Amino acid sequence: MAAGGAGGNSGKTYSFKVVLLGEGCVGKTSLVLRYCENKFNDKHITTLQASFLTKKLNITGRRVNLAIWDTAGQERFHALGPIYYRDSNGAILVYDITDEDSFQKVKNWVKELRKMLGNEICLCIVGNKIDLDKDRHVSVEEAESYAESVGAKHYHTSAKLNKGIEELFLDLCKRMMETAQAEERLKGNGASQSASSRRGVQIVDDEPQATPAGGCCSSG
């Protein structure tokens, strides 16, 4: 179900599915753990197939429930990607700024997502590990130019230093809310059900509660 108009959404709860994609060792799991639990482990954490975390937020008086899927980056798990990104409202495509190949693999994911889900999914391209900027192999200009060319937004993050992560997820949530609200307006005008509606955006009337902006998070 899609969202209502911007003027009457103060009592709504939005439920969104977000998937993280990218090569192994780019730091996807570290980003999610830093965002949800404010934890960081210097040791590489290998994700097998996928892990799942949730985050609850209050954004401009509207409650948002995020279901965040962290997928495995190993090539042997690539074929499982569609299982996790179908029905997603947003995708975070992560590369390591010190690894040019990981950036090229992001381009493959973008092509696949656009082919399977169309243009309505909100895409974020993330250059992670900016704490290693002296070893950078992907230029800021190249990455930002590419993101703009495919209708995505680009972000720089460091899970180690806890930089850029809150901004990334907050901005993505706002974009998904805007998309959902636009779909609800179309629905109110008698338009046929859209792709994002079919992807399962859930917005329900709710009694607003005083939830801190940071929200809470639990593993599932």
Question: Model-derived features: where do they sit?
Answer:
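Conserved P-loop small GTPase signature centered on TRAFAC-class small GTPases
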Residues: 1-25, 63, 120-125, 129-220
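Walker A/P-loop
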Residues: 29
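Switch I (effector-binding) loop of TRAFAC-class P-loop GTPase G-domains
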Residues: 37-63
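Conserved catalytic network of the ASCE P-loop NTPase/AAA+ motor domain
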Residues: 58-61, 83-87, 114-119
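Switch II (G3) loop of P-loop NTPases
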Residues: 64-77
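Conserved beta-strand segments of the P-loop GTPase G domain that flank and frequently precede/overlap
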Residues: 68-69, 92-96, 124-128, 157
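Conserved Switch II/interswitch segment of TRAFAC-class P-loop GTPases
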Residues: 88-107, 117-120, 131-137
